[in-house]
């Protein structure tokens, strides 16, 4: 679950440091992962991805984060860094990114980037500007949709997901953005091949990541706890809102 990934900065504690600290009071080892991956797991367990073996989760928020579910499992890669779609380079964009690179998707499609390009202070002002027909705001949103579609198209060529699940404040503020993203994504796919990739909204609220984290923490010694949503000997669990972690776990068994 990302435990092999190390940041190059000394500003963050290592897993060893965190383990020593937490074991002063608790027995189990800590499990470290990011909010986007836990939100993707929640969607796989109880949300929009509950009947899908493979999907890409993308969150457009203060940053741009991604996660891949393939064959009913979260994909972490060799060091837990797989799915960093927000830091794929887009076209001729040369804007500096907080990660240290230039031209990342995050510099076009995150809330701060969109607000900066549109000349507004926050997402509320951005929505008002777009709805009022402000050219600068609309251009910024269109540029973001095209960039997101480009990145998702490239990712789709690699893993052939059943769907793209998009989440975050930007999608909440502009529901029609999903169709713009889908159109841009399909332009990147091979036209002579038959593709069936839906771009859908996330169905769980902001507590989804916390619920999935609790689910994982309750199963620290189960190797398959990170499996997305394929119960042993059965079909994927039913879709629906994660109103209760305990109720869902009782109904569906372990993933």
Language-model features, listed with the residues they occupy:
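Glycine-rich phosphate-binding loop of actin/hexokinase-like ATP-binding domains
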Residues: 52-108
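Conserved phosphate-binding catalytic cores of ATP/NTP-utilizing and phosphoryl-transfer enzymes
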Residues: 34-55
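Short beta-strand-loop/turn "lid" adjacent to the catalytic site in phosphate-handling enzymes
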Residues: 1-13, 163, 168-170
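Short loop-beta-helix segment that forms the pyridoxal 5′-phosphate
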Residues: 28-33
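Short secondary-structure boundary segments
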Residues: 34, 60, 168-169
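Short, active-site-adjacent cap segments at secondary-structure transitions
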Residues: 1, 37-40, 65-66, 75, ...
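ATP-binding/phosphotransfer module of carbohydrate and carboxylate kinases, centering on a glycine-rich
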Residues: 20, 24-26, 46, 51-52, ...
């Amino acid at each position: 679950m990302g435990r092999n990934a190390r940041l190059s900065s000394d500003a963050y504690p290592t897993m060893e440091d965190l383990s020593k600290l937490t074991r002063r009071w608790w027995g189990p080892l800590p499990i470290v992962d990011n909010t986007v991956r836990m939100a993707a797991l929640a969607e796989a367990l109880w949300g929009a991805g509950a009947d899908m073996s493979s999907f890409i989760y993308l969150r457009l928020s203060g940053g741009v984060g991604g996660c891949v579910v393939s064959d009913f499992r979260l994909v972490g890669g060799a060091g837990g860094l797989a799915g960093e779609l927000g830091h794929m380079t887009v076209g001729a964009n040369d804007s500096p990114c907080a990660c240290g690179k230039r031209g990342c998707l995050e510099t076009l499609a995150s809330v701060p980037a969109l607000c900066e390009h549109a000349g507004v202070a926050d997402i509320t002002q951005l929505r008002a500007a777009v709805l009022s027909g402000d050219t600068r705001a609309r251009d910024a949103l269109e540029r973001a949709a095209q960039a997101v579609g480009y990145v998702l198209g490239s990712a789709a060529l690699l893993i052939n997901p059943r769907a793209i699940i998009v989440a975050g404040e930007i999608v909440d503020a502009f529901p029609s953005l999903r169709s713009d993203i889908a159109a841009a994504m399909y332009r990147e796919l091979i036209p002579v091949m038959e593709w069936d990739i839906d771009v859908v909204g996330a169905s769980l609220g902001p507590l989804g990541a916390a619920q999935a984290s609790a689910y994982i923490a309750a199963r620290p010694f189960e190797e398959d706890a990170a499996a997305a949503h394929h119960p042993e000997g059965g079909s994927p669990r039913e879709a629906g809102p994660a109103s209760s972690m305990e109720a869902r776990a009782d109904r569906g068994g372990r993933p």
